[in-house]
């Protein structure tokens, strides 16, 4: 089969646009794709919530990839061990109360489980602000969405209007 670059471009644009349009209104918007964001995305999506996670960097997982000083092992205590094992990450006891896990296995598993549960992950997007709606009573004032732009726009300090999503 001869490769058709236009079909590739069309596929990327259409599929991303479908995903983006589907996430203009979500139940939960998570800012940050580090370990906490990925775990939250998994548990919320697994319970049937419509979840979108936004990460400003190219890669998700935060600093977990690098473990300690780029030795790609992480150390967790009992609570972290339980979460990792619940998501399918192998842990090993080290000393009393300390457990280790492979940082690459942990990061990729958290990401895979979040996506598998239905969370949508948008990388290279920065959050510029939140959308707040006030009502007559101060108790009812709440955050209802996010103001989002491409990370490249932020880094280049370009004056480009952002887009919004509601949650």
Predicted region positions:
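Conserved N-terminal glycine-rich FAD pyrophosphate-binding loop of Rossmann-like flavoproteins
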Residues: 4-6, 22, 57-80
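Conserved FAD-binding subdomain of flavin-dependent enzymes
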Residues: 43, 59, 72-94
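Glycine-rich Rossmann-fold phosphate-binding loop(s) that bind the pyrophosphate
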Residues: 32-36
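Conserved beta-strand-loop-beta-strand element in the redox core of flavoprotein oxidoreductases
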Residues: 131-166
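Extreme N-terminal leader/targeting segments of oxidoreductases
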Residues: 1-28, 113, 117, 130, ...
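Short beta-strand to alpha-helix junction loop
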Residues: 72-76, 93-112, 122
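Glycine-rich FAD pyrophosphate-binding loop
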Residues: 29, 45-65
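Short phosphate-binding/catalytic loops that engage adenosine nucleotides
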Residues: 49, 89, 119
């Amino acid at each position: 089969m001869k490769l058709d670059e236009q079909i590739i471009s069309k596929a990327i644009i259409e599929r991303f646009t479908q995903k983006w349009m589907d996430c203009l209104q979500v139940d939960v918007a998570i800012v940050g794709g580090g370990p906490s964001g990925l775990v939250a995305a998994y548990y919320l999506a697994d319970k049937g919530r419509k979840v979108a996670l936004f990460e400003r960097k190219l890669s998700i997982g935060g600093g977990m990839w690098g473990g300690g000083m780029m030795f790609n092992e992480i150390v967790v205590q009992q609570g972290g061990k339980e979460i990792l094992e619940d998501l399918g990450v192998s842990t090993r006891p080290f000393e009393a109360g300390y457990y280790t896990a492979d940082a690459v296995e942990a990061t990729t598993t958290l990401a895979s489980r979040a996506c598998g549960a239905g969370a949508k992950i948008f990388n290279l997007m920065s959050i510029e602000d939140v959308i707040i709606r006030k009502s007559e009573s101060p108790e009812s004032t709440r955050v209802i969405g996010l103001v989002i732009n491409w990370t490249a726009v932020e880094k280049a300090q370009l004056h480009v209007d952002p887009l919004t999503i509601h949650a």
